[in-house]
Every structure is written in structure tokens, then in C-alpha cells.
Amino acid sequence: MSTIQNLQSFDPFADATKGDDLLPAGTEDYIHIRIQQRNGRKTLTTVQGIADDYDKKKLVKAFKKKFACNGTVIEHPEYGEVIQLQGDQRKNICQFLLEVGIVKEEQLKVHGF
């Protein structure tokens, strides 16, 4: 007699990785740009999720030259190769990746304060 009406409802607590088929065509993964607090006012910006097609050391070299900061590529046990830059470079990295065409706007995820 009674039917369940919300079988098709969205579950906000469902595992986010199960919805990969809902992403627009041409998007592989997200690029996460995070900021981490160091001692005092010093910060680190980390970039994770850049495809293996790109040479991360060359990207770091371009970032260092354009943003006038130091940077390196580290191997993270969970996330793989991660780019670390000194200072708050979140906006600069977003603009650079969009200008060069490495990423689309909807693929960027900026985390932090």
C-alpha cells in the first residue's frame, strides 16, 4: 500500500569516490591546493593531484621563478608526489594553472583558512 518515495534522494554522507561517473566529460581528478601553518606567520602551500603527464620538477621551477618563492617536490605516502611552495601561493597557483591550461576551473579545490 505505501511506497517509499525517497529511494532516489541524494545522500550527503555517501562516499564521495563513488560518484566519479557524475563528473563532466574530460575531468580526471581534482587538484587540491592547500595551505599549512608553520611556525609564526610562515606558511606552506601544497599542490596535490597534478597528473603524471606533467614533469613536477619543471612546474616547481616555473612556480619558483614566477612567484619568487622556494619550492620542492616531496613524496607523500598517501598522496604521491606533492609540490610544496613557501608562502601563501594559492591564488597565484590557481591563475598559473588556468593560464597554462593544465587544469579547468571546476577541477580546482582550494583549501585553507
From Swiss-Prot:
Residues recorded as bearing N-acetylserine in the entry: S2
InterPro entries: SUI1, SUI1_dom_sf, SUI1_euk
PROSITE patterns membership: SUI1
GO process annotations (BP): regulation of translational initiation
Residue list for modification Phosphoserine: S9
Statement: the UniProt record of this protein carries the keyword Magnesium: no
Pfam families: SUI1
GO molecular function terms listed in the Swiss-Prot or TrEMBL record: ribosomal small subunit binding; RNA binding; translation initiation factor activity
Keywords: Acetylation, Initiation factor, Phosphoprotein, Protein biosynthesis
Cellular component terms (Gene Ontology): eukaryotic 43S preinitiation complex
Protein role: Probably involved in translation.
Similarity-based family: Belongs to the SUI1 family.
Name of this protein: Eukaryotic translation initiation factor 1b
Naturally occurring in which organism (per UniProt): Homo sapiens
Gene it is expressed from: EIF1B
